[in-house]
């Protein structure tokens, strides 16, 4: 088991809410999956808190992925945000589901996620863990049997 990368991101909820409310913005549609939009809208009068936490999670995943590829291009694409989805289990615990290029570039990686809100701040912490031989593949080494 190897830690491949760590990512942390903070979002100011009020500033994020302003961005979402701008006339003509396509951020929700272009950055969040339909499932994420349904979840956030179900959170009552302040969906921006949930959107901000999910945005922080997406950014934290990208930072963790980039740190795992130090001095090399991350290669996830021009708009990776809808490829990184925050999902919740039956008890509300969040986790990351990767799609498309993100899933291809991070095969077999375990993504640990923690989200929090406090006052006007949402935060996410992500740890990418290789449960086996992936670190060797990323570094270009021959995987050991």
Curated annotation (Swiss-Prot):
A cellular component term, taken from the record's GO annotations: cytoplasm
A GO biological-process term: fatty acid biosynthetic process
Catalytic activity: apo-[ACP] + CoA = holo-[ACP] + adenosine 3',5'-bisphosphate + H(+)
Obligatory cofactor(s): Mg(2+)
Record's keyword terms, sorted: Cytoplasm, Fatty acid biosynthesis, Fatty acid metabolism, Lipid biosynthesis, Lipid metabolism, Magnesium, Metal-binding, Transferase
Top-level EC class as recorded in UniProt: transferase
UniProt cross-references to InterPro entries, sorted A to Z: 4-PPantetheinyl_Trfase_dom (IPR008278), 4-PPantetheinyl_Trfase_dom_sf (IPR037143), ACPS (IPR002582), Ppantetheine-prot_Trfase_dom (IPR004568)
Full protein name: Holo-[acyl-carrier-protein] synthase
């Amino acid at each position: 088991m190897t830690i491949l990368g760590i990512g942390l991101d903070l979002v100011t909820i009020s500033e994020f809410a302003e961005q979402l409310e701008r006339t003509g913005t396509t951020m929700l549609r272009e950055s969040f999956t339909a499932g994420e939009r349904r979840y956030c809208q179900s959170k009552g009068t302040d969906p921006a808190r949930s959107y901000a936490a999910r945005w922080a999670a997406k950014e934290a995943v990208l930072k963790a992925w980039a740190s795992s590829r130090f001095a090399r291009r991350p290669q996830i694409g021009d708009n990776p945000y809808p490829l990184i989805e925050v999902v919740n289990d039956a008890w509300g615990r969040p986790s990351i589901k990767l799609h498309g290029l993100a899933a291809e570039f991070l095969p077999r990686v375990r993504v640990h996620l923690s989200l929090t809100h406090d006052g006007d701040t949402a935060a996410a912490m992500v740890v990418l863990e290789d449960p086996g031989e992936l670190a060797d593949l990323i570094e270009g080494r021959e995987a050991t049997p």
